[in-house]
């Protein structure tokens, strides 16, 4: 925008869309030299919409600076000239606050000189006319003011100020003028823009004075502040702080530092003193040295220094006659001195003795020398030491030592670990001679009676402390066809007794059977009546035929190999007119049919069984009815289920399941993490009786010892040399140990469910 001559205004008109209201901006620039600076002009703005006074101010402050603030008559004339007429006129930035008309932009009260009220205004009609309007282009009072209620809607008359954030360098008050501004500098500042700061000049400080200054506005200028202190050994004489005033003068003269003074000293009785005073007599840094006459010694420091606090470094020493400190009487000893009373002066002597059981450590006689020291330290009495003894194997030792570890009057008590017996004295004492009153005892392992394997069974024992000794564990299992009667595991207790009576192996029995009606029964019993291995032969009377198996055997599962047969009278029937559907043998099963009236004719009976490891699901026999229908559907053979294996340790398990998960023929292998060994079998197979061939193993840390290896060989004696040859035998023993059965037995119909070491087979079906 081009400049205009001083005192003239050139209006420019432009339209902008701002907040939905069309605004007409009248702006004028005045180019004039103020304090040798060019400043921008004040710009006036107004809204095209009418608002209440409050909303008018919001509008002005949002888009410009504020509601217009009238500064002089020329400004009023200019506004009346350039602003268009509006019938409800314009709001300006004056409002009644606390009953005083106030310029809201500066919060300054309106002065009488600046008032431009219309005639008979302000009149405050109805006591609510707190805001001011300006009559623009009014025929009766152009440019005059009138008080109005603030809620009335008028146009907002706004301005954009010449004063900016950095005007007057922020070091003075910016005062708006028409088209410009002037600066009223704060105290301590000067210049057209208040850009200069008053200076007080550099402070000259005396010797030993320390100064620390802060200069917020420049070195040694207005508001600079300097604090003073003294070097060590000096004290301040004068003000501790100076400040540069707005007048450019310091608040006071700088202080000076004087040396700190200590109290005067004199030589002690029977002594001399020599002093050095580098600054002043008995002042900071002065030092005095003291010496005592012959036959006396100084008590205290022989050199004193005057410190920065005005105090001597040590109290004044004294000279006292030479004497030795009283020696201490040794504990558990006695002392005899010459002279026996008074102070221990030069040439005094003392002798020492110890009580029984103690020996003197040091000189037995000492003398007070001319230096005030004894010729040797006072001795002490030490309890006689008894020799250390090895702690017996499997034993616990508890010693009380009143005068030191294993010394005179020490008492040691012995006890054996659980499962061991004490042989010898349970308590020994250290005597005054330095010897024990007896030898330490020994602990021998508790033994139980030898254990034998049950008949028709086997036994596996772990004996870490020797054959049939404490902590020995024996597990029992029976041969196939037998069940365990009694505990599966026995332990050798600390009392030397097994935890129970050895078990026996009893033959598994099948249910009792009887001769069929019109038939005969003949049985042979290997292991008792109807025990496992018993075989029964059936036959029928004359004119009767056998329906079913002629021979049945009691199996290891406690079941007969086939249902008992029946005897039926022989009759002649005509050929059947109907046939039942031909039957097929079930998978993994067997079928045997008796055709009385032709193949699969009426009364044909078919018997079904399953191969080893499979159980029948359905009827074990079907009969063909006269209607041509079988009495039931063909049964199926399902693989026997073993209990699911749940590993509660870190054992890794890998299983193959040919007939379904954890079924007959399933084989699981086990492995331990690196650094652990497998305790049990590396493999378990689901057997035909629904039990696993081996117990679940566990993982345990540690290595196999020679003693454990010998134990698993039944306690056989082998020389250490033989075991070491090539490491071969030890490796074989490790392999043997890993395969060792842990004694857990398969479940059978006579087992106690939940007994320690027995697999509980929840899938076992006792029905035929």
UniProtKB/Swiss-Prot annotation:
<feature type="topological domain" description="Cytoplasmic">
    <location>
        <begin position="734"/>
        <end position="768"/>
    </location>
</feature>
<feature type="domain" description="Sushi 5">
    <location>
        <begin position="446"/>
        <end position="507"/>
    </location>
</feature>
<feature type="lipid moiety-binding region" description="S-palmitoyl cysteine; alternate">
    <location>
        <position position="745"/>
    </location>
</feature>
<dbReference type="GO" id="GO:0031092">
    <property type="term" value="C:platelet alpha granule membrane"/>
</dbReference>
<dbReference type="GO" id="GO:0005178">
    <property type="term" value="F:integrin binding"/>
</dbReference>
<dbReference type="GO" id="GO:0005509">
    <property type="term" value="F:calcium ion binding"/>
</dbReference>
<feature type="binding site">
    <location>
        <position position="146"/>
    </location>
    <ligand>
        <name>a carbohydrate</name>
    </ligand>
</feature>
<feature type="binding site">
    <location>
        <position position="146"/>
    </location>
    <ligand>
        <name>Ca(2+)</name>
    </ligand>
</feature>
<dbReference type="GO" id="GO:0007157">
    <property type="term" value="P:heterophilic cell-cell adhesion via plasma membrane cell adhesion molecules"/>
</dbReference>
<dbReference type="GO" id="GO:0070492">
    <property type="term" value="F:oligosaccharide binding"/>
</dbReference>
<keyword id="KW-0479">Metal-binding</keyword>
<dbReference type="GO" id="GO:0016339">
    <property type="term" value="P:calcium-dependent cell-cell adhesion via plasma membrane cell adhesion molecules"/>
</dbReference>
<dbReference type="GO" id="GO:0007159">
    <property type="term" value="P:leukocyte cell-cell adhesion"/>
</dbReference>
<dbReference type="InterPro" id="IPR000742">
    <property type="entry name" value="EGF-like_dom"/>
</dbReference>
<feature type="binding site">
    <location>
        <position position="124"/>
    </location>
    <ligand>
        <name>Ca(2+)</name>
    </ligand>
</feature>
<feature type="disulfide bond">
    <location>
        <begin position="292"/>
        <end position="319"/>
    </location>
</feature>
<keyword id="KW-0732">Signal</keyword>
<keyword id="KW-0564">Palmitate</keyword>
<comment type="subunit">
    <text>Interacts with SNX17. Interacts with SELPLG/PSGL1 and PODXL2 and mediates neutrophil adhesion and leukocyte rolling. This interaction requires the sialyl-Lewis X epitope of SELPLG and PODXL2, and specific tyrosine sulfation on SELPLG. Interacts (via C-type lectin domain) with alpha-IIb/beta3 integrin ITGA2B:ITGB3 and alpha-V/beta-3 integrin ITGAV:ITGB3. Interacts with alpha5/beta1 integrin ITGA5:ITGB1 and alpha4/beta1 integrin ITGA4:ITGB.</text>
</comment>
<keyword id="KW-0768">Sushi</keyword>
<feature type="binding site">
    <location>
        <position position="123"/>
    </location>
    <ligand>
        <name>Ca(2+)</name>
    </ligand>
</feature>
<feature type="lipid moiety-binding region" description="S-stearoyl cysteine; alternate">
    <location>
        <position position="745"/>
    </location>
</feature>
<keyword id="KW-0430">Lectin</keyword>
<dbReference type="GO" id="GO:0005886">
    <property type="term" value="C:plasma membrane"/>
</dbReference>
<feature type="glycosylation site" description="N-linked (GlcNAc...) asparagine">
    <location>
        <position position="398"/>
    </location>
</feature>
<dbReference type="Pfam" id="PF00059">
    <property type="entry name" value="Lectin_C"/>
</dbReference>
<feature type="disulfide bond">
    <location>
        <begin position="448"/>
        <end position="492"/>
    </location>
</feature>
<feature type="topological domain" description="Extracellular">
    <location>
        <begin position="42"/>
        <end position="709"/>
    </location>
</feature>
<dbReference type="GO" id="GO:0009897">
    <property type="term" value="C:external side of plasma membrane"/>
</dbReference>
<feature type="disulfide bond">
    <location>
        <begin position="416"/>
        <end position="443"/>
    </location>
</feature>
<dbReference type="GO" id="GO:0033691">
    <property type="term" value="F:sialic acid binding"/>
</dbReference>
<dbReference type="InterPro" id="IPR016186">
    <property type="entry name" value="C-type_lectin-like/link_sf"/>
</dbReference>
<dbReference type="GO" id="GO:0042806">
    <property type="term" value="F:fucose binding"/>
</dbReference>
<feature type="disulfide bond">
    <location>
        <begin position="540"/>
        <end position="567"/>
    </location>
</feature>
<feature type="disulfide bond">
    <location>
        <begin position="200"/>
        <end position="244"/>
    </location>
</feature>
<feature type="disulfide bond">
    <location>
        <begin position="354"/>
        <end position="381"/>
    </location>
</feature>
<keyword id="KW-0106">Calcium</keyword>
<dbReference type="GO" id="GO:0016020">
    <property type="term" value="C:membrane"/>
</dbReference>
<feature type="binding site">
    <location>
        <position position="147"/>
    </location>
    <ligand>
        <name>Ca(2+)</name>
    </ligand>
</feature>
<protein>
    <recommendedName>
        <fullName>P-selectin</fullName>
    </recommendedName>
</protein>
<dbReference type="GO" id="GO:0001530">
    <property type="term" value="F:lipopolysaccharide binding"/>
</dbReference>
<feature type="disulfide bond">
    <location>
        <begin position="168"/>
        <end position="183"/>
    </location>
</feature>
């Amino acid at each position: 925008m081009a400049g205009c001559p001083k005192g003239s205004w050139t209006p420019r008109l432009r339209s902008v869309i701002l907040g939905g209201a069309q605004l007409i901006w009248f702006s004028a620039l005045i180019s004039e030299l103020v304090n040798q600076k060019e400043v921008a002009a004040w710009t006036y703005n107004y809204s095209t919409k009418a608002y209440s006074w409050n909303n008018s101010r919001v509008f002005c402050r949002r888009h410009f600076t504020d509601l217009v603030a009238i500064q002089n008559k020329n400004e009023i004339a200019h506004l009346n000239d350039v602003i268009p007429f509006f019938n409800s006129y314009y709001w300006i930035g004056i409002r009644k606050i606390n009953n005083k008309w106030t310029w809201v932009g500066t919060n300054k009260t309106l002065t009488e000189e600046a008032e431009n009220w219309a005639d008979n205004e302000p009149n405050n009609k109805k006591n609510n006319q707190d805001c001011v309007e300006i009559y623009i282009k009014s025929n009766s009072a152009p440019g005059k003011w009138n008080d109005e209620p603030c809620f009335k809607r008028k146009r907002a008359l706004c301005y954009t100020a010449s004063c900016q954030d950095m005007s007057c360098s922020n070091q003075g008050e910016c005062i708006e003028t028409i088209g410009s501004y002037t600066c009223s500098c704060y105290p301590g500042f000067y210049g057209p823009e208040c850009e200069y700061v008053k200076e007080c000049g550099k402070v000259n400080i005396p010797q030993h004075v320390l100064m620390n200054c802060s200069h917020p506005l420049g070195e040694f200028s207005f508001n600079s502040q300097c604090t003073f202190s003294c070097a060590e050994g000096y004290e301040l004489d004068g003000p501790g702080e100076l400040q540069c005033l707005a007048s450019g003068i310091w608040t006071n003269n700088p202080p000076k530092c004087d040396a700190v003074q200590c109290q005067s000293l004199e030589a002690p009785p029977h002594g001399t003193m020599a002093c050095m005073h580098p600054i002043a007599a008995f002042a900071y840094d002065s030092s005095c040295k003291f010496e005592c006459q012959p036959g006396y010694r100084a008590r205290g420091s022989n050199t004193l220094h005057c410190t920065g606090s005005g105090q001597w470094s040590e109290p004044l020493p004294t000279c006292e006659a030479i004497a030795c400190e009283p020696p201490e009487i040794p504990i558990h000893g006695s002392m005899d001195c010459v002279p026996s009373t008074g102070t221990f002066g030069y040439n005094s002597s003392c002798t020492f003795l110890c009580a029984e059981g103690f020996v003197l450590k040091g000189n037995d006689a000492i003398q007070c020398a001319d230096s005030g020291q004894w010729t040797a330290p006072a001795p002490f009495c030490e309890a006689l030491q008894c020799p250390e003894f090895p702690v017996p194997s499997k034993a616990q030792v508890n010693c009380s030592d009143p005068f030191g570890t294993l010394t005179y009057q020490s008492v040691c008590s012995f006890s054996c670990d659980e499962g061991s017996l004490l042989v010898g004295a349970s308590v020994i004492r250290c005597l005054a001679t330095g010897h024990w009153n007896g030898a330490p005892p020994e602990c021998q392992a508790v033994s139980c009676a030898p254990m034998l394997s049950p008949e028709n069974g086997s036994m596996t024992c772990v004996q870490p402390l020797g054959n049939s000794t404490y902590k020995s564990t024996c597990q029992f299992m029976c041969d196939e066809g037998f069940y365990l009667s009694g505990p599966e595991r026995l332990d050798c207790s600390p009392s030397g007794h097994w935890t129970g009576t050895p078990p026996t192996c009893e033959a598994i029995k099948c249910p009792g059977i009887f001769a069929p009606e019109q038939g005969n029964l003949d049985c042979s019993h290997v292991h008792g009546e109807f025990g496992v291995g018993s075989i029964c032969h059936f036959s029928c009377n004359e004119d009767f035929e056998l329906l079913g198996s002629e021979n049945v055997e009691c199996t290891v599962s406690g079941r007969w190999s086939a249902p008992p047969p029946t005897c039926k009278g022989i009759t002649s029937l005509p050929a059947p007119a109907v046939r039942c559907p031909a039957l097929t043998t079930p998978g993994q099963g067997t079928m045997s049919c008796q055709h009385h009236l032709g193949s699969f004719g009426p009364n044909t009976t078919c018997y079904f069984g399953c191969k080893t490891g499979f159980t029948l699901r359905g009827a074990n026999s079907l009969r063909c009815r006269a209607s041509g229908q079988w009495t039931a559907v063909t049964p199926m053979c399902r693989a026997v289920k073993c209990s699911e294996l749940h590993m509660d340790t870190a054992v890794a398990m890998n299983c193959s399941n040919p007939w379904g998960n954890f079924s007959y023929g399933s084989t699981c292998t086990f492995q331990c993490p690196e650094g652990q060994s497998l305790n049990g079998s590396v493999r378990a197979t689901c057997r035909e009786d629904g039990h696993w061939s081996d117990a679940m193993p566990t993982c345990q840390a540690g290595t196999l010892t020679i003693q454990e290896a010998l134990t698993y060989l039944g306690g056989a004696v082998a020389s250490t040399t033989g075991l070491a040859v090539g490491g071969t035998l030890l490796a074989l023993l490790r392999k043997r140990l890993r395969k060792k059965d842990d004694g857990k037995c398969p479940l059978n119909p006579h087992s106690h469910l939940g007994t320690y070491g027995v697999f509980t087979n929840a899938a076992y079906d006792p029905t035929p």
